[in-house]
Amino acid sequence: MKERGLNPRDLIPYIGSQSGVYQILLGKRGLSMPMARALHKHLGISAESLLREPVPGPMPSNESTDGMRWDRFPLKVMVKRGWIPDGPNLAGRSEELLRGLIDRAQGGNAPALYRKNDQGRINAKVDPYALKAWCWQVMATANERLPVANYEPGVVTLDFLNQVAQLSRLGDGPRHAKDLLEEHGIPLVILPHLPRTYLDGAALRLQDGRPVIGLTLRYDRIDNFWFCLLHELAHVGRHLNGSESDAFIDDLTLRKSDGRPEDPREAQADEWAEEALIPSEVWEATDMRNSPTAIGLLSLANELKIHPAIIAGRIRFERKNYRLLSQFVGAGQIRRQFDAPNSDSKW
């Protein structure tokens, strides 16, 4: 199939259904002679390969789906958002519909790695099925809109993050950041979170190794956007360049939560994001930490060539006072740049 540029969807007319295709690819079901003849005649697949003893795999996901409760996915919400097609008996067709999404995600690795990352920043109340669905849709969207440029491992450095951070001073900086990432082969997907995902963003890897960043824009503020973006970029630069596949799924409200086990990689991503936005030597020397003023905030932002919201956000976070400097954080300024819906619909 790979040699002929075929994907599982191409087999459906000759196998009969999408679920049947996946059962055959998994080795759970054999080809009938009429199916084999049709595949050989219409798709040119050699008789030798069709008659070969089936081997389990490759499954279009890197996790086993044994025991998967397909009907527990938020199917109605997914239909409403256009992630899966509508039709009668959604629950009865749930496996077929979800395998179609997995196919579009090209077997994304996020679901299997959800368990590996569960000591990171995943909310204890999360619905794992909704979280998997969101990750698959991010990867499916990225696959459908792949940047022309190839991704070169090692391109995402602290200097690169600093370059991205300085785009924040532009009125349409978020759009420029998306363009810059795509110029380096990294898709940025803006996708509203699903109920009970408690999610801000994720750094995932596509099947070919290309990283993809997904952001929910759960909190529509300038300061939040830039920290979330740089945090996920830091995961790309520091943690996704190895040979081991991985995924990082983040509820950033859990950042530095007291008494919660912390994945050291999350602290490393925080470190890069903070350093790229406001270098530590500058932050430690400024009076803004203890005596913030509007004039001082604007002056420091101008010196660092970043948006004032970033400094306001850092002060608010460190003081745990989210009423402070609220006029500077740029509430309501991000979603509209991505043609994103307002809080009355998907957000």
Where are these regions (language model features)?
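Short alpha-helical DNA-recognition segment
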Residues: 6-20
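Active-site hotspot residues in diverse enzymes, especially metal/ion-binding acidic/histidine motifs
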Residues: 2, 20-21, 29, 37, ...
